[in-house]
Design a protein with these regions (language model features):
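Membrane-proximal interfacial segments on either side of biological membranes
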Residues: 1-347
């Protein structure tokens, strides 16, 4: 129980460390101002904080009710730059040390994530409840180990709008810029199973395998699937900090199972069509600007199946600036025809 008199703290810092004093600092929060006091009206301790974490400003309110048999806590955090609100309600288990259960919710950019969880010692088990992402429902479950910190989550989405998702991710870009996702102390894995993709012409479903390991965000083993045409595989796909720049590199192989459907989708003229098993890309992007560098583009790259189809390197034939200027699906199909026309002249 706190004092009835309000305690104020200004211009301070909070260091979060693992219980072992030899461990590095996990989180550093700067406090602009805060107040701590006991509220007689609701018989609860109250804490209000204005501060920043990883250079992201936040407002935090904590209410601890001391009137009940089991201590209950209500937590509210507002992250201004992210336009996000985090709420958490949990009840401590007085019969078991370091154990409690609760419900958490995160609201951002028209999305709502609700979680039911249970913590026993260092293990947290969680499940979703009536959650939505860009107005589409989804579910998830997983575990979090608090020391050493590691999470493993599986998220199942029936539908996702790719355009809206990209817009939302652009708002969350500073999660990467401020070393939240790339924090070497926050390791874990999230697998996204997406049954249906909206707002994208070529692919129907996806599996995104996202790992964060030692300050690197790894997307290897992720796939995009076209049920009628083939599957795109991401290998050696990593986002990391290099010389204070956030660089994404990826090797991508699009295996084509139905050449006829592929060419029909892009409306490639019959005289320009070649025998095509796959398309291979190597790309690099600096997240601080809009520059994308295509390192390689190869048609019919030699892989395990040892296809006899001729490999064609398009790395010097493709102009990245021309690709950037494509505004819609119609322009993409027109540009693809131009490329396959040039390829037909090479054979």
């Amino acid at each position: 129980k706190l004092s009835n008199k309000k305690i104020q703290i200004k211009k301070s810092k909070i260091f979060f460390k693992e219980s072992n004093s030899t461990k590095d600092v996990v989180v550093l929060s700067t406090i602009s101002k805060s107040s701590l006091f006991y509220d007689k009206k609701v018989n609860a301790n109250k804490v209000n904080i204005e501060g920043s974490i990883y250079n992201t400003k936040y407002n935090l309110s904590l209410l601890r009710n001391t009137n009940k048999k089991n201590t209950t806590d209500d937590l509210l955090i507002k992250l201004k730059k992210l336009n996000a609100i985090i709420k958490n309600e949990f009840v401590s288990d007085e019969n078991k040390k370091n154990s409690y259960s609760g419900k958490a919710s995160i609201n951002f950019s028209g999305s709502e994530i609700n979680t039911i969880y249970r913590k026993d010692d260092k293990l947290i088990k969680l499940n979703s409840e009536k959650s939505r992402l860009n107005n589409y429902s989804f579910d998830f479950k997983g575990e979090i180990i608090t020391s050493p910190f590691y999470y493993n989550l599986v998220v199942n989405l029936e539908v996702i709008n790719v355009v809206k998702m990209i817009e939302s991710l652009s708002k969350l870009k500073n999660l990467v810029d401020k070393k939240i996702l790339l924090n070497p102390n926050l390791n874990g894995k999230i697998t996204f199973n997406i049954n249906s993709l909206k707002g994208i012409k070529f692919f129907d479903g996806a599996k995104i395998d996202l790992k964060v390991i030692n300050g690197k965000l790894i997307l290897s083993n992720s796939t995009l699937t076209s049920y009628k045409i083939g599957k795109m595989f991401f290998t050696d796909s990593v986002l990391e900090s290099v010389d204070n720049k956030k660089i994404f590199k990826s090797k991508i192989l699009f295996k084509i199972s139905n050449q006829k459907k592929f060419y029909q989708k892009l409306l490639i003229s019959r005289p320009y069509r070649i025998k095509l098993n796959n398309v291979y890309f190597e790309i690099e992007k600096d997240l601080n600007n809009n520059e994308v560098e295509i390192k390689k583009i190869i048609l019919n790259k030699k892989i395990v199946d040892n296809s006899s189809n001729k490999s064609i390197d398009l790395s010097n034939l493709i102009d990245v600036n021309e690709i950037k200027e494509l505004k819609n699906w119609i322009e993409l199909k027109k540009y693809s025809n131009q490329i396959f026309f040039k390829i037909s002249k090479l054979n």
